[in-house]
């Protein structure tokens, strides 16, 4: 087994990735062929296991190979499928502005999730006939809430009991339960005003919207401390403690939406606001949409003790919106340690993809671009030299079949630079160069 490694400009894991990709597409490795194990491959190529694992994860993310538990990596039938692709479908339909490279849509890389494993847990849940004959508990299945307590305490320093947890199909449905519980608090402020789905719920309940935190005495403050805006932003421990102190002094309730807290590339996740308060004065919200799949509509809310009694009086008014079968499946999935391993795998895949996207951007655009990999989420932030506003550039790229997200602010425009954001999950690594070439044409 040999491989060309003299191109030092390309990271070693990408050289391994390209080597195997070409072998697969050329027919040198047939569908069903087992690749060397990470240990054996690293010895054969005289590379580290981390290098081999990164290459294999990228190959899996692009569909060239598939991981079979306790067996290894196997070549898929992607080469055969590519032979039958209708080339005309791959061309950009300019009239309809068909998007060929979508760097905007927030999704999960298909190879970061073990579908076969998840199907096994769902099948097990669906075999529990007696449990499925009854409606689910309005608050969520008890064993699911027990598991959540342990998981949140260990991973996010959340302090709670199963009685404090309410399960629902999405954060929006949980906010509809929460708003009547805090009806005496008539004012709300969002750190990130772009969260329209959340704002819509409070608007439905007649809340007054405030633009500043110092306007919400005895009100509600909604914040995502692990990703404060779409463009990232992480609250420091000091900022968290300052917010808690201010909430105590001015008697406002904090709603902590812990979105993307598990996906920290370069540092450990900060402890939750809820945990820092000792479990009081904070409503904690979490979801499995990024940790598992967006289609698994499973979110949860941890009520502070002072709101639990209020909820218990109204609990009979609500039906459970989340799937009972999925709650049963996730419960065992977490117990068996698969959620933690799923998060680790997802981090590795998306960091590898983001790193490669940033490299391609610098290679193609050179001095016209500066890149930064987002600390939270799956994004690459790009500062560009161009005569256009960010929103204008987004329109120009869309006409060429390339979707990018423009930064709404223009603070860098004085020095001829704008910012855009690229989500790396939805575009295949092999398409990065073509996509960035299109971006270059639009500058």
Describe each model-derived feature in a short phrase.
Residues 282-363, 370-372:
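PLP-dependent aminotransferase class I/II
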Residues 73, 222, 300-303:
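Short glycine- and hydrophobic/aromatic-rich loop-to-beta-strand nucleating segment
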Residues 89-91, 193-197, 213-214, 408-412:
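Short, polar loop motifs at secondary-structure junctions
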Residues 1-123, 130-133, 312, 316-323, ...:
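N-terminal basic, amphipathic alpha-helical segments
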Residues 105, 190, 211, 222-224, ...:
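Short beta-strand segments
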Residues 106-110, 172-173, 194-196, 226-229, ...:
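Short, solvent-exposed loop/turn segments at secondary-structure junctions
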Residues 125, 129-250, 255, 261-263, ...:
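Conserved core of the PLP fold type I
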């Amino acid at each position: 087994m040999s491989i060309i490694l003299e191109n030092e400009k390309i990271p070693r894991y990408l050289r391994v990735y390209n080597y195997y990709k070409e072998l697969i597409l050329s027919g040198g490795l047939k569908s069903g062929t087992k690749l060397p194990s990470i240990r054996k491959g690293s010895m054969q190529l005289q590379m580290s296991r981390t290098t081999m694992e990164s290459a294999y994860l990228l190959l899996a993310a692009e569909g060239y190979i598939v991981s079979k538990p306790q067996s290894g990596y196997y070549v898929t039938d992607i080469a055969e499928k590519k032979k039958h692709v209708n080339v005309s479908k791959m061309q950009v339909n300019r009239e309809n502005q068909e998007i060929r490279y979508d760097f905007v849509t927030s999704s999960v890389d298909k190879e970061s999730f073990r579908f076969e494993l998840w199907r096994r847990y769902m099948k097990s849940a669906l075999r529990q006939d007696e449990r499925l004959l009854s409606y689910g508990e309005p608050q969520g299945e008890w064993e699911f809430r027990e598991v959540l307590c342990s998981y949140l305490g260990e991973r996010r320093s959340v302090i709670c009991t199963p009685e404090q947890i309410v399960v629902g199909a999405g954060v929006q449905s949980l906010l509809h339960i929460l708003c009547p519980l805090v009806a005496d608090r008539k004012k709300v402020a969002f750190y990130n005003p772009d969260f329209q789905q959340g704002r819509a719920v409070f608007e439905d309940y007649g809340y007054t919207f405030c633009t500043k935190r110092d306007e919400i005495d005895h009100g509600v403050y909604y914040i995502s401390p692990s990703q404060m805006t779409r463009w990232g932003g992480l609250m420091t421990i000091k900022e968290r403690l300052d917010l808690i102190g201010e909430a105590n002094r001015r008697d406002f309730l904090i709603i902590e939406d812990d979105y993307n807290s598990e996906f920290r590339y370069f540092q450990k996740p900060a402890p939750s606001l809820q945990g820092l308060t000792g479990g009081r004065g904070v409503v904690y919200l979490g979801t499995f949409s990024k940790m598992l799949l967006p289609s698994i509509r499973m979110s949860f809310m941890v009520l502070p003790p002072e709101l639990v009694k209020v909820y218990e009086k109204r609990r009979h008014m609500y039906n459970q919106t989340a799937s009972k079968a999925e709650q049963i499946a996730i419960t065992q999935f977490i117990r068996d340690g698969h959620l933690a391993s799923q998060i680790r795998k997802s981090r590795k895949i998306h960091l590898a993809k983001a790193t490669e996207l940033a490299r391609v951007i610098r290679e193609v655009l050179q001095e016209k671009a500066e890149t930064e990999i987002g600390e939270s989420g799956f994004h690459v932030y790009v500062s560009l030299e161009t005569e256009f506003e960010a929103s204008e550039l987004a329109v120009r790229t869309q006409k060429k079949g390339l979707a990018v997200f423009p930064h709404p602010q223009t603070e860098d425009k004085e020095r001829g630079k704008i910012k855009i954001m690229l989500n790396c999950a939805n575009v295949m690594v092999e398409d990065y160069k073509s996509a960035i070439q299109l971006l270059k044409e639009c500058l």
